[in-house]
C-alpha cells in the first residue's frame, strides 16, 4: 500500500498531522531531514509528499528537484511559515501542487487528506466537502470517517462563528448540515447571517461567500 510521506523537523507539529491522517485510514511515514526524505522516497511506495520549506540539512525545494530529476510523479505539497511571495512561483514552476501557510493547521491537514484521497482513487476522483455544525461526539467522528470512504469530507464545527470562518476559508464547501440549537445561537441565526453575507458578495467578480444548500435538524441521520 502506498504511503503518505511528511517531511518536517518540528516533531510536535508533524505528530498531529500524522495522527489525523492515520485516523482516516492512511499509512504515514515521517522524515525530519532532506536526506531521510530521499531515503524513504527510494525505499517506499509514496502516495503524496508534504514538506516544510526549511529543513535542518537543506530545503524542501531540494527534495522537489530530486523528484523531478528522478522523474517520480509524486504529488508534492509545501507547508511553511515563509511568505509565499518568496518561494511559491519557483515551487509551482518546479512541479509543486500547492503551497500552504503552516500556521493554518486545519487547512494543511485537510488539503493533504484531499490530495491523498484523489491520488489513491485515480485521476478524476471527486472529493466533496460539506460543513456540519453540531456539537462534536463519537458518532459524528464515525460518520466523518465513513463518508470519507465515499469521497465526502465532512468539516465539523460546533458554533456559528466557527462555521462562518470555515465558509470564508473553504470556497469549495457544497452543503451545510446544522443542528437547530447551537452554543452561540440557533440555526436560523446562522442561515440569515449566511444569506446576508452572500447578498453582499453576489455582484462581485469572484465572490468569497455564496449561498449554499442548508439543512436543519435536531438529529442528523445519515444512512450509508
Model features per residue range: what roles?
Residues 30-39, 60, 156-165, 187:
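Helix N-cap/capping motif at the beta->alpha junctions
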Residues 39, 61-73, 188-209:
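Short amphipathic alpha-helix used as the core "switch/output" element in two-component signaling
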Residues 49, 76, 99-100, 176:
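Two-component signal transduction core modules
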Residues 10-36, 137-156:
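Two-component/phosphorelay signaling modules centered on CheY-like receiver
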Residues 1-5, 105-129, 134-144, 161, ...:
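Non-catalytic signal-transmission and effector/linker regions of two-component phosphorelay proteins
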Residues 62, 83-100, 106, 188-189, ...:
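Alpha4 helix (beta4-alpha4-beta5 surface) of REC/receiver domains from two-component response regulators
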Residues 7-8, 31, 49, 133-134, ...:
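Conserved sequence signature across two-component system core domains
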Residues 44-50, 55, 171-177, 182:
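Active-site beta3 strand of CheY-like receiver
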Amino acid at each position: 500500500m502506498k504511503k503518505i510521506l511528511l517531511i518536517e523537523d518540528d516533531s510536535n507539529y508533524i505528530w498531529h498531522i500524522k495522527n489525523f491522517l492515520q485516523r482516516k485510514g492512511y499509512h504515514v511515514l515521517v522524515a525530519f531531514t532532506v536526506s531521510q526524505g530521499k531515503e524513504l522516497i527510494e525505499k517506499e511506495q509514496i502516495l503524496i509528499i508534504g514538506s516544510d520549506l526549511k529543513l535542518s540539512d537543506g530545503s524542501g525545494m531540494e527534495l522537489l528537484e530530486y523528484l523531478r530529476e528522478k522523474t517520480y510523479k509524486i504529488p508534492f505539497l509545501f507547508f511553511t511559515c515563509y511568505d509565499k511571495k518568496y518561494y511559491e512561483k519557483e515551487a509551482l514552476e518546479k512541479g509543486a501542487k500547492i503551497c500552504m501557510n503552516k500556521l493554518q493547521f486545519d487547512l494543511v491537514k485537510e488539503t493533504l487528506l484531499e490530495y491523498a484521497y484523489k491520488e489513491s482513487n485515480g485521476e478524476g476522483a471527486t472529493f466533496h466537502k460539506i460543513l456540519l455544525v453540531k456539537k462534536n461526539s463519537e458518532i459524528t467522528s464515525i460518520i466523518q470517517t465513513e463518508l470519507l470512504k465515499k469521497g465526502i469530507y465532512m468539516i465539523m464545527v460546533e458554533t456559528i462563528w466557527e462555521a462562518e470562518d470555515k465558509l470564508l476559508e473553504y470556497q469549495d464547501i457544497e452543503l451545510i448540515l446544522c443542528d437547530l440549537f447551537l452554543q452561540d445561537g440557533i440555526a436560523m441565526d446562522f442561515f440569515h447571517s449566511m444569506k446576508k453575507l452572500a447578498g453582499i458578495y453576489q455582484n462581485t467578480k469572484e465572490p468569497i461567500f455564496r449561498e449554499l444548500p442548508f439543512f436543519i435538524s435536531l438529529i442528523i441521520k445519515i444512512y450509508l
